[in-house]
Swiss-Prot record:
Phylogenetic lineage: Eukaryota, Metazoa, Chordata, Craniata, Vertebrata
Name of the molecule in the record: Muscarinic acetylcholine receptor M2
Residues bearing the modification Phosphothreonine: 445, 449, 464
Organism for this UniProt entry: Bos taurus (Bovine)
Domain of life: Eukaryota
Cellular localisation: Cell membrane; Postsynaptic cell membrane
GO cellular component: dendrite; plasma membrane; postsynaptic membrane; synapse
């Protein structure tokens, strides 16, 4: 009991803050730590459970959230303890481990921001070649490299500097990096760890913004009529004429014809066909389907991803139908253009069947000749660019005060009060609190997924857009 009392008296004597100030600091710092932990766990869980968030860019954000989570759990709370007590009570080993963890994680955050900036830069400047290389495996390798490099740069120097120079110069009750007592080293590390990355990221974002604006202006200047239509020579038709008996398992006559300007050559190749409804769905294709029967009217429905044409209605259940299907395959990437179009026609042997096939075929070929409507720039690309801008601004605003003080301290150590140092250091930590808010504000999918998780609405959360 006496030891405990003496320890409490020592804390009271050495603490620079009064009791109510200590309570206030602990409440504020504890709240920030809790918000940081919850926010970054939400980011990580959202990416894990929502398949629409499982993109290469968001994997980089997942790595950044891991770093921010570590800061919220360890760095914030240990620094709060150090601040309110007024001295370091946990000994030199824990001090060095905390500093190593703190600086490795902080540097990993900067490295992740650099990776995100370079990734977006290459996506914009090399849209044809870079997306091919931009795989999940490559993203994992880049993330691993960022963490390993950060560890190599900071951990050995912090943990073993005292053994390299042969003496520990950090006094008991204090906790700081020993080689930071050298003004030149402090200046150099500030340049390498903050100023150089900020310059690189700013230049990259300027190029990203410039390229995006240039593309938007170019798209606005191009009239819709000048866009390349889908070439009718790429449209291939397949007409299927089932036998009159049309029993399950029976062989149907199959004719393959090319449709050019609404006409089909007489030469045909006969194959077997299994009757039934066919459906195709792919991230890299757009489907257009048409169904024709006893035609009474024409219906055309279009949306962003599919075009569906229904011609006529069936008078009875036994009447046969004519099906036309167009599958437009497009390459992977942020911007896709049609590369091949296939038309399949399934016809009936009923009366006027050939007439109906020709009418529907002409409609489809006419539709494929029409130029596609001009689409605005992809919203996903805008989301990514806005998110990058938000996290870069948050990083610069929160880290700049401390790193400016580091440079000032190099030339004038007494110029900066201890309280200002503490606030500047805490601002660096607050960046980890702000990042999840940046994701939610700039990306509606993140925001909706956060809301579902917080309100325990787990139904269909994996498909939230």
């Amino acid at each position: 009991m006496n030891n405990s009392t003496n320890s409490s008296n020592n804390v009271a004597l050495t603490s620079p803050y009064k009791t109510f100030e200590v309570v206030f600091i602990v409440l504020v710092a504890g709240s920030l730590s809790l918000v940081t932990i919850i926010g970054n766990i939400l980011v990580m869980v959202s990416i894990k459970v929502n398949r629409h968030l499982q993109t290469v860019n968001n994997y980089f954000l997942f790595s950044l959230a891991c770093a921010d989570l570590i800061i919220g759990v360890f760095s914030m709370n240990l620094y709060t303890l150090y601040t309110v007590i007024g001295y370091w009570p946990l000994g030199p080993v824990v001090c060095d481990l905390w500093l190593a963890l703190d600086y490795v994680v902080s540097n990993a955050s900067v490295m992740n921001l650099l990776i995100i900036s370079f990734d977006r830069y290459f996506c914009v400047t090399k849209p044809l070649t870079y997306p091919v290389k931009r795989t999940t495996k490559m993203a994992g390798m880049m993330i691993a490299a960022a963490w390993v490099l950060s560890f190599i740069l900071w951990a050995p120097a912090i943990l073993f500097w005292q053994f390299i120079v042969g003496v520990r110069t950090v006094e008991d009750g204090e906790c700081y990096i020993q080689f930071f007592s050298n003004a030149a080293v402090t200046f150099g590390t500030a340049i390498a760890a903050f100023y150089l990355p900020v310059i690189i990221m700013t230049v990259l974002y300027w190029h990203i913004s410039r390229a995006s604006k240039s593309r938007i202006k170019k798209d606005k200047k191009e009239p819709v009529a000048n866009q390349d239509p889908v070439s009718p020579s790429l449209v291939q038709g397949r007409i299927v004429k089932p036998n009159n008996n049309n029993m399950p398992g029976s062989d149907d006559g199959l004719e393959h014809n090319k449709i050019q300007n609404g006409k089909t050559p007489r030469d045909a190749v006969t194959e077997n066909c299994v009757q039934g409804e066919e459906k195709e769905s792919s991230n890299d294709s757009t489907s257009v389907s048409a169904v024709a029967s006893n035609m009474r009217d024409d219906e055309i429905t279009q949306d962003e991803n599919t075009v569906s044409t229904s011609v006529g209605h069936s008078k009875d259940e036994n009447s046969k139908q004519t099906c036309i299907k167009i599958v437009t395959k497009t390459p992977k990437g942020d911007q896709c253009t049609p590369t091949n179009t296939t038309v399949e026609l399934v016809g009936s042997s009923g009366q006027n069947g050939d007439e109906k096939q020709n009418i529907v075929a002409r409609k489809i070929v006419k539709m494929t000749k029409q130029p596609a409507k001009k689409k605005p720039p992809p919203s996903r690309e805008k989301k990514v660019t806005r998110t990058i801008l938000a996290i870069l601004l948050a990083f610069i605003i929160t880290w700049a005060p401390y790193n400016v003080m580091v440079l000032i301290n190099t030339f004038c150590a007494p110029c900066i009060p201890n309280t200002v140092w503490t606030i500047g250091y805490w601002l660096c930590y607050i960046n980890s609190t702000i990042n999840p808010a940046c994701y939610a504000l700039c990306n509606a999918t993140f925001k909706k997924t956060f809301k579902h998780l917080l309100m325990c609405h787990y139904k269909n959360i994996g498909a939230t857009r």
